[in-house]
């Protein structure tokens, strides 16, 4: 039965109207309100990392990458998959401002699949392959046109490594990361505008025939953007990013703190989810189960089976969905993670 409060012996201020009283007290933040309220940029970090994760490996849909997974292509990459991912995303953005492309992405009923590979929008770099082969640097016009798209594109193209100025074209045995030998002032004043394909991967042979680049830009099958599961997640993130643009857009591209942590979340999520393989019965481990997609022909990675042979592991669609979810979880945990870091104070 229930008791009725008649009188209080002691300090009545310690009791509520029903006679309940706390039996203990703590200075710890049990409700963890500080986690949610102290990080004003946490929402932007989470949403940007999540959208970049949905985009980061789209370039793995290329014929060249799928052939490499099957062991049919062993030469050094001419174009890395993250650069193809960037170009695919920018083809979707087109000439729109941030609000326009986010509104298109927020409509999960419209796949907009054609615009991702429309020849008029999908610019395919073929560096050093002859006159007229150069394509405009991706960030040159994007910085003013759609700064949020530029920030997302930066996360996509840097999820493995940061751009590096390529060695001089006259150098022999050119490799990515070799010393440039000179420095240009605009790299400090406008660091993104000059970034081109060879900042991501150097073409060792400047005489590479144009046809050799084609498998890197031609898709081996439908992009994951055509799948409802992908569009649903992308639309959800796009709607949140649209809200962050209210009442006026914020310059996230120049917020180094946000970009650095969003990139950290994306890279950690990518490494984590890529490490998830099969259980002892040859089935996807439990952590993968919510994201496994059936009837997929494009894959993101491989795994050794029990006989020591390489087999397809995560489908490309599964990988994008899983990494996006992991990036969201990691970014959500950042405020709590901070408390466990060593500090001077």
Residue positions per predicted region:
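Auxiliary, metal-adjacent structural segments of Zn-dependent hydrolase domains
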Residues: 2-18
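Walker A/P-loop
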Residues: 343-345
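Accessory nucleic-acid engagement/destabilization modules that flank
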Residues: 1-2, 11, 23-326
């Amino acid at each position: 039965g229930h008791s009725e409060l008649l009188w209080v012996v002691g300090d009545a201020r310690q009791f509520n109207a029903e006679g309940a009283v706390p039996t203990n007290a703590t200075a710890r933040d049990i409700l963890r309100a500080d986690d949610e309220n102290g990080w004003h940029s946490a929402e932007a970090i989470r949403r940007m990392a999540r959208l970049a994760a949905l985009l980061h490996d789209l370039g793995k849909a290329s014929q060249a990458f799928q052939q490499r997974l099957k062991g049919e292509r062993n030469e050094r990459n001419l174009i890395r998959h993250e650069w193809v991912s960037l170009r695919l995303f920018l083809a979707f953005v087109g000439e729109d401002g941030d609000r326009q492309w986010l509104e298109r992405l927020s409509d999960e009923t419209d796949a907009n699949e054609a615009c991702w590979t429309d020849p008029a929008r999908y610019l395919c770099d073929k560096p050093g392959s002859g006159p007229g082969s150069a394509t405009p640097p991706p960030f040159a016009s994007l910085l003013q046109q759609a700064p949020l798209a530029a920030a997302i594109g930066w996360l996509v193209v840097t999820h493995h490594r940061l751009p590096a100025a390529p060695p001089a074209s006259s150098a022999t045995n050119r490799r990515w990361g070799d010393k440039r030998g000179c420095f240009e002032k605009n790299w400090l004043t406008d660091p993104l505008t000059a970034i081109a394909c060879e900042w991501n991967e150097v073409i060792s042979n400047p005489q590479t025939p144009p046809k050799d680049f084609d498998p890197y830009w031609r898709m081996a099958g439908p992009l994951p953007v055509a799948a409802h599961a992908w569009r649903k997640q992308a639309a959800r993130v796009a709607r949140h990013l649209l809200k962050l643009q209210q009442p006026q857009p914020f310059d996230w591209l120049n917020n180094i703190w946000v970009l650095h942590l969003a990139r950290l979340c994306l890279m950690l999520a990518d490494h984590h989810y890529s490490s998830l393989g099969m259980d002892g019965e040859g089935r996807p481990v439990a952590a993968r189960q919510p994201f496994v997609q059936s009837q997929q022909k494009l894959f993101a990675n491989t795994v050794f089976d029990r006989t020591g042979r390489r087999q397809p592991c995560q489908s490309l669609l599964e990988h994008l969905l899983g990494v996006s979810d992991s990036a969201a979880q990691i970014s959500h945990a950042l405020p709590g993670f901070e408390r466990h870091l060593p500090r001077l104070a």
